[in-house]
Regions:
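Short aromatic-glycine-(Arg/Gly/Cys) micro-motifs in beta-strand/loop hairpins
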Residues: 279-285
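Active-site metal-binding loops of divalent metal-dependent hydrolases
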Residues: 44, 112, 315
Length: 339
């Protein structure tokens, strides 16, 4: 007996087979792409900065990518002047949350602007500040991500300043007439406690960024610690002809130094991230995330007679020719290549 099959009868199994093939391809693609993303939310001490016109300010989050191999992507969403409250109310948190995928990480660091008195930003430790931190943690976990809480980096405050908090927005030291002592003085108070408390309560990794940066600045002293910050004399750098006295925000050297220390602390607690940890002597990038934006300057800074590894990030580069006496090894990252 001859059985006739309609086009519809044939289409059904073909559709099923096609669906299965596409599913297998999708799974294979997912497994092949083993990169994970570290999302970052926070304020100006972490944020990416405008580097045009030789501007020197950097957030430590700009430099974090230097300390991971190509298996980790750092996606920094920190924004100048934001508190945990304004970051949520402006829709910035939703935009980040929509991008988070299972297996990703989220670094949360607020406090500098939660201290501000204006209603758009102010939160209170123990109540509204803690509630916002819990929300970040809970919603990140719901997306399959691993949240990481940090408290605020320290302000360089060696005097009995009453204006240190307000000076963040001014990018100035309104108390520069006060004599500086030898001991760093805290300006954050209970805003340092909330991230630790929420981390313990919710079983989240906590990095004490305040202690780490406090110890760094204290060890460098009241004069040496100026090298970390946006403290320039008039005419010292073209982008600041009148100079600047900013004890909160980092310059290139400071941001890179802090990023390295916080990455070390992070990798000590998160084994999966530690697998991707890398360290090089010098970092070069055209997007402001390096210590230098050109190879010639990077090579010139390398000491003679000592092996130095220079990481070159992204883009096309001309390999320097004049390297007499320099034992330099280049490592190309993020798709960088020599012409």
């Amino acid at each position: 007996m001859k059985i006739k099959k309609s086009i519809a009868d044939l289409a059904a199994p073909l559709h099923t087979i096609l669906t299965m093939v596409l599913a297998v391809l999708a799974i294979s693609s997912f497994r092949a792409d083993k990169t994970k993303t570290i999302f970052m939310i926070g304020d100006s001490t972490m944020a990416n900065k405008d580097i045009s016109g030789d501007k020197q300010e950097r957030g430590w989050g700009m430099m974090l990518q230097n300390y991971f191999d190509d298996g980790i992507i750092v996606d920094n969403h920190a924004v100048n002047g934001r508190s945990s409250k304004s970051f949520i109310n402006e829709g910035r948190w939703k935009a980040v949350l929509d991008r988070i995928m299972p297996g990703d990480y989220l670094i949360i660091q607020f406090g500098h602007n939660d201290e501000k008195t204006d209603s758009a930003r102010h939160t209170t430790p123990g109540t509204t500040f803690d509630a916002n931190l819990r929300r970040f943690v809970r919603e990140a976990r719901e997306k399959g991500a691993t949240p990481i809480l940090m408290n605020s980096v320290v302000r360089r405050n060696f005097s009995d300043s009453k204006t240190a908090v307000a000076d963040d927005d001014l990018r100035d030291n309104s108390s520069k007439q006060l004599a500086e002592g030898d001991t760093l003085i805290d300006t954050h108070g209970e805003y340092l406690v909330s991230p630790r408390r929420v981390a313990k309560e919710m079983g989240v990794v906590f990095v004490d960024a305040n202690k780490i940066t406090h110890d760094l600045e204290q060890s460098m002293g009241k004069e040496g610690s100026k090298k970390l910050h946006m403290i320039f004399k008039p005419g010292e750098t073209p982008s600041l002809p009148d100079g600047r006295q900013d004890n909160t925000h980092y310059n290139i050297f400071g941001a890179n130094k802090v990023a390295g220390l916080l990455d070390d602390a992070l990798c000590r607690q998160v084994a999966e991230l530690a697998k991707h940890h890398v360290y090089y002597d010098i970092y070069v990038s055209k997007n402001g995330s390096g210590q230098f934006d050109d190879l010639e300057s990077a090579v010139a800074s390398a000491p003679k007679g000592r092996k130095v590894t220079i990481a070159v990030s992204g883009g096309e580069w001309k390999k320097p020719e004049a390297m007499k006496g320099k034992k330099v090894k280049f490592v190309l990252t993020r798709g960088a290549k020599f012409l």
